[in-house]
A protein has these predicted regions:
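Basic nucleic-acid-binding interfaces
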Residues: 1-74
Length: 74
């Protein structure tokens, strides 16, 4: 399984759209993206990149494999 690298929030959103997610939409304290009935809460904008640990958790929740994620790399 490939090792992830940190990504910017903008890159995360663009790459999630490749997997069929729409959004981000405003909701509560965090924005979210949707794919069908699945809702994925995404981190708020901040200065740094999204850590490898958080990215791994988001991908697991979105049911996206590490191999598929790496294929969308620019």
């Amino acid at each position: 399984m490939p090792r992830h690298s940190p990504v910017s929030r903008r890159d995360l959103i663009q790459r999630l759209k490749v997997f069929g997610f729409t959004g981000p939409f405003i909701g509560g304290r965090h924005e979210f993206m949707e794919r069908g009935t699945q809702r994925l809460i995404i981190p708020n904008p901040h200065r740094g990149d999204i850590s490898v640990d958080l990215l791994s958790r988001l991908l697991r929740q979105a049911h996206i494999s590490a191999d598929d994620w790496e294929k969308t790399k620019n």
